[in-house]
Amino acid sequence: MEELPQSSDFRSIVLNNTPLIDVRAPVEFAKGAFPHAVNLPLMNDEERHVVGIKYKEEGNAEAVKLGHALVSGDVKEARIKAWTDFIASHPDAMLYCFRGGQRSQIAQEWLAENGREIVRLKGGYKAFRNWLMQETEKAVEQFKPIVLGGRTGSGKTILLKKLQNAIDLEGLANHRGSSFGRDITPQPTLIDFENALAYDLIQKLDQGFEHLVFEDEGKCVGRIYLPKILVEHLSEAPLVVLETPTEKRIEITFDEYVAKAHEKYKEVYHADYLKVWTEDMHEAMKRIQKRLGGQRYKIVCEIFEDALKEQKKNSSLEGYKVWIAYLLSEYYDPMYDYQIERNASRILFRGNAQEIEAFLKEYR
C-alpha cells in the first residue's frame, strides 16, 4: 500500500479547530486529550491491556497478531463504522494515537481500504502535546498582560466575556476560583486544561492582539495549577480594578451561586437537588471555617440555615442574599482589600464595567 498522508502542521490544526479522532484506549484519553478530539479507540482498555502483556512477554510481532485477532470480524467493522460516521460529518478530521505509530497507521489503512482517506498526526499525541507546551512558553513572551481585579461579585467574568482579547481561565478550568466555585460538572484534567489554554493563547495571538486580559487569579483555579511561566508573567502585570456597588455585587453573586446553581442542580439531581446543593454549600463553608474563625463560621451557618428554612417554607430564595452579604463583608472583602493594598503600585485604572471596557479598547 502506498504511503498514507501524515501532517505535523499543528498550528493549522489549532487555528482551524480541526476535529480529531483519538484512537487510543479510553483510559489514555481520560488522562488528557486535545480540544475537538473524540475518542473512537482501535482497542478498548481490556484489549489494550492484554496486548500490552503479550508485547512484554513475546515482543511486537506477537502483540500485533493478538491485536488483529481481538479486533476482527464484527468488532473491527464496528470500529471502522464509528470512524467513517465521524468522518462523514467532519470531513476535515485527522486521527492520532500516542506516538503516531502502529495504532493510528492501522486505523488509517483500514479506512483507506473502505474508501476513506484521512491524515494522521505525525508523532501522534506526544508530538502535538509537546508542541503545544512549547508554544505556551513562547506565547507568554509575545503578549502584554492586563489583570482584571475587583471584589467578589463585581462582575469580572461577565465583563471578561465581552472582551475579544480575554483569556477566561475560570471557564477553561470549569471553576469560579473561590471556595464556593466548584461547578456541578467536574474540572478537566490538568492536561486537558493546559491543551485548551495553549489553543486559546495561539488563536488570540494569531488574531493580532498585543494585550491579553486575564482575571486576577492565584497559582491555581480550583485544583488546576496554572503554568508557572504564566503565573510569573501575570504577577507583575498592570491591574485594572472593577468597582461595583455592594447591592449589585450581592445580586450578581446571588444570580450565579444560588439562582442559576439551583437550576443546574435540578437538571442533574431532580427531586434531590436541594439536598445535594445544601451539602455542597456546607462543604464550601467548612473549607473557609479556619479563616472565618469560630464565631463568624457559626453565624454564617445560622444565616444559611435560616435561608434554607425560608426556601422550604415559602419557596423564596431571598434569604440567601443575607447570607451572601455576610460572606462578602466578613470574609471576601477584607481578604481582597488586603491583597489589593499590597499591589496598589500595579493599579492602572479603576472604574465600572462600562468605563473599563472603554478604557481597554483605547489602551495601547
Curated annotation (Swiss-Prot):
Disulphide bridges, residue numbers: none
Sequence ranges assigned to domain Rhodanese in this UniProt record: 14-136
InterPro entries in the cross-refs: P-loop_NTPase, Rhodanese-like_dom, Rhodanese-like_dom_sf, SelU
Superkingdom classification of source: Bacteria
Any GO MF annotation of the entry: tRNA 2-selenouridine synthase activity
EC annotation from Swiss-Prot or TrEMBL: 2.9.1.3
BP GO terms, sorted: tRNA wobble uridine modification
Gene3D superfamilies attached to this UniProt entry: Rhodanese-like domain (3.40.250.10)
Catalytic activity: 5-methylaminomethyl-2-thiouridine(34) in tRNA + selenophosphate + (2E)-geranyl diphosphate + H2O + H(+) = 5-methylaminomethyl-2-selenouridine(34) in tRNA + (2E)-thiogeraniol + phosphate + diphosphate; 5-methylaminomethyl-2-thiouridine(34) in tRNA + (2E)-geranyl diphosphate = 5-methylaminomethyl-S-(2E)-geranyl-thiouridine(34) in tRNA + diphosphate; 5-methylaminomethyl-S-(2E)-geranyl-thiouridine(34) in tRNA + selenophosphate + H(+) = 5-methylaminomethyl-2-(Se-phospho)selenouridine(34) in tRNA + (2E)-thiogeraniol; 5-methylaminomethyl-2-(Se-phospho)selenouridine(34) in tRNA + H2O = 5-methylaminomethyl-2-selenouridine(34) in tRNA + phosphate
Keywords annotated in UniProt: Selenium, Transferase
Catalytic residues (positions): 97
CDD domains assigned to the protein according to its UniProt record, in alphabetical order: RHOD_YbbB
Class of this enzyme: transferase
Record NCBIfam families: PRK11784.1-2, PRK11784.1-3, tRNA_sel_U_synt
Assembly and binders: Monomer.
Function: Involved in the post-transcriptional modification of the uridine at the wobble position (U34) of tRNA(Lys), tRNA(Glu) and tRNA(Gln). Catalyzes the conversion of 2-thiouridine (S2U-RNA) to 2-selenouridine (Se2U-RNA). Acts in a two-step process involving geranylation of 2-thiouridine (S2U) to S-geranyl-2-thiouridine (geS2U) and subsequent selenation of the latter derivative to 2-selenouridine (Se2U) in the tRNA chain.
The family this protein is said to belong to: Belongs to the SelU family.
PANTHER family in alphabetical order: TRNA 2-SELENOURIDINE SYNTHASE (PTHR30401:SF0)
Protein name as catalogued: tRNA 2-selenouridine synthase
